Amino acid sequence: KLAKDNGEIGTLEMIIITSRDPEPPGIEYLKAAGGFFRDTTIHDFDLSRFILGDDPIVEVSAYGSQLISEECKEVGDHDTAMFIMRSQKGVLIHINNSRRAVYGYDQRVEIFGSKGMMISNNQSPSSVEKFDKEKTYSKDLIHFFFIERYAQAYKDQLDAFVNIVMNNEKPSVSFEDGRNALILANAAYDSLNNGQSMKVVY
């Protein structure tokens, strides 16, 4: 985000987010999760808003399928989804989610602008790769779940929370940030159920 705010990729034009879990959760979790869009995609809605900054998302189109999990079907939830959104300034955002990625916890972000592109890719325990005249050897599998993938981020968040409490500071994340991500999730469900793009009302 800092690179985007500093103009390193020029004028922002597209955001592409991939977020896929390694395997579906159990049925008891699904019953209490509030639906795929409010459980999983809500983090991607929040991330999109964070990257966009003062450019709010004004329109959302959502598509969902039941392709993977019998438990999802049983509770009437989706396990595969895609979203196209548009910001007030015309930036287009694509999000794709899945409850199953057999190769691990797939988390990628791309921002594309008038001067270039930046990508945050998947992380592996090791970045070592081997090349010889026969073939290119695959590197280690990506992290399997969010605990491993975001271990450092959780530590940083806890440190930031302690610092806020100890120094009586205002947190950088507000109630409105969470509320607006939920508004986007609800608008996405409206789009899915109505079969049309929905304007977002905050």
Question: What feature does the model see in each segment?
Answer:
Residues E71-E74, M85-D156, S174:
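NAD(P)-dinucleotide binding in Rossmann-like oxidoreductases
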Residues M14-I17, A153-A160:
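Generic alpha-helical secondary structure signal
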Residues Q88, A160-Y202:
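C-terminal helix-rich "cap/oligomerization" subdomain common to oxidoreductases
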Residues I15-T18, A62, V200:
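Short glycine/serine/threonine-enriched helix-capping/active-site loop
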Residues K1-G26:
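A contiguous active-site-proximal alpha/beta segment in oxidoreductase catalytic domains
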